[in-house]
């Protein structure tokens, strides 16, 4: 039997795609290994969001080729960098056999066979009219992912933010039918999932078909919540423009829906938001936050921020700081703006100096870290439900789980009783990125 190794970069959608690729390829006679040195087929499933993504791919490809150049191996470049770079990958890394975009991964079996027969380069970066989900059998979905599972419900993006390549690498927005999603959710729960994370590039833009109707995300969540042994539901990533009434109500009425929303704002300046083509204002964003908090007082938020977008002044940046101070995030992710070839932001002449971007990022991160630590410290002395997987902690007998607010929670579990269970935990200590607790015996 041949062996398959997949390295995944980037977002949860890529993790889900890697799981799909495993399930697609295993019937060809492959077993999955965790060591690239033992693999006959190597797939790098890439992400194009962050700076120098293409260079990181070429560097990794070079390392693999150098270490395996005397052994027969098939190398596949997959994901969003593969979509963006296309044939250029073969020019810069001629030892790569296959290039496949994220919407074409279902064609991998044919591409692998074709590459083995021709001993030449094979590429598929099409956006097929038949979506990738429609090409797959039920056997490719819902296989065991442990106690917490990913389920893709929506792909692509129609927003065209001026800093982002996703519309060009993932294509137009597409929503899977309700029944297809529900079948996969049932199968995931039957295979041990207690929590399902609903995924989409703009997950709250979901508009799936159900018996001649169009359902939004809130209605879908209420439907999935009926699955008896499913205990938790999450969704990511949402866009402020796509918030809708039934999603507000789902947070108020569905106990299984976790009280935590990742809602990227990117900037606290209306001028910069217009330049980014985000199509909402800071005032509208804050109205969304307040509406959720009124309906669900214990709800918490995380967000994404880009500092140093072209044209950002000190006043614009201060707007971001004021917004963070007002919202008080449980978590947040912040990055310096980096140009993406082919996006409108890359063409602008008013780029912010790198030194200024670095200074602003450090200022913002200091505030975000302070808020995150304070939120974590507010948990000390409380008892919270924690979902544990098989993730081990730094110390012997220690296991790590997730709180409803996505905090990492460590406890001692010498008898391995808590794995794949939701356990009530008393929080004893808190740090920047984790909590320490002890299991409360029933």
UniProtKB/Swiss-Prot annotation:
This is tRNA-2-methylthio-N(6)-dimethylallyladenosine synthase. CDD domains: Radical_SAM (cd01335). One of its GO terms (molecular function) is metal ion binding. Pfam families: Radical_SAM, TRAM, UPF0004. One of its GO terms (cellular component) is cytosol. [4Fe-4S] cluster 1 binds at residues 11, 47, 80. Binds 2 [4Fe-4S] clusters. One cluster is coordinated with 3 cysteines and an exchangeable S-adenosyl-L-methionine.
